[in-house]
């Protein structure tokens, strides 16, 4: 996988900040840049607006402990549905979601001129456009774990869809009672059910 070091610029001071990402095709879905609050390189920039390359969107630099000081430049762009970490951060920081990849596996309208491309195609084209604009500091080849479909071996993308959720907490005791009346083969599976029921803490 290619780790692309891209040039972002703060709005007020026009200070260059390098942000490394393996997903430059998701620049259009970037809604904040996080830095570790202990990272002295960025302590004076927290709260400032920063301009996303190519899209020219403005996002806020946000302190967050999950930004690893030693990885890349220490500054991380957070894009909705980039990976599970991004999803968790979007929920925690209550950011507005942007759906960059559709159900057809192609870039959506928010990707503008990259609309209709597959993510890998968009990545290649965006890296080329970033380089032509002088917005790439360097590119590194790295080993990167990517979840793959078991059947097709194609990288899995997180795509938001409507889902229905059932209330669980109020039925835990009833489920335990029913579970204790069922004969399990092997018997240890009954304990697996009970352990799972004990782990339910939210609806």
PLM regions: where:
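Short secondary-structure junctions
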Residues: 49, 134-141
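Alpha-helix capping and helix-loop boundary segments enriched in small/acidic/polar residues
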Residues: 74-81, 114-118, 166
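Active-site neighborhoods of enzyme catalytic cores
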Residues: 1-26, 118, 122, 138-168, ...
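NTP-handling and nucleic-acid-processing catalytic cores
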Residues: 1-104, 128, 132, 171, ...
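A glycine-biased structural micro-motif
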Residues: 44-47, 113-124
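Short glycine/serine/threonine/alanine-rich loop segments
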Residues: 95, 116, 135
């Amino acid at each position: 996988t290619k780790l692309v070091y891209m040039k972002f610029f703060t709005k007020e001071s026009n200070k260059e900040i390098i942000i490394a990402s393996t997903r430059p095709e998701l620049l259009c879905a970037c809604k904040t840049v996080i830095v570790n609050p202990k990272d002295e390189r960025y302590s004076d920039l927290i709260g400032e607006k920063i301009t996303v390359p190519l899209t020219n969107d403005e996002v806020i630099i946000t302190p967050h402990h999950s930004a690893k000081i030693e990885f890349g430049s220490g500054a991380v762009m957070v894009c909705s549905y980039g990976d599970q970490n991004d999803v968790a951060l979007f929920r925690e920081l209550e950011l507005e979601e942007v759906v960059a990849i559709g159900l057809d596996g192609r870039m959506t309208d928010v990707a503008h001129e990259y609309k209709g491309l597959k993510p890998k195609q968009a990545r290649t084209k965006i890296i080329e456009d970033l380089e032509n604009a002088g917005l790439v500091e360097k590119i590194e080849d790295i080993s990167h774990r990517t979840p793959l479909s078991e059947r097709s071996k194609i990288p899995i993308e997180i795509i938001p869809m409507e889902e229905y959720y059932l209330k669980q907490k109020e039925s835990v005791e009833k489920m335990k009672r029913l579970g204790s009346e069922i004969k399990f083969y092997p018997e240890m599976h009954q304990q697996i059910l009970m352990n799972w029921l004990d782990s339910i803490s939210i609806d």
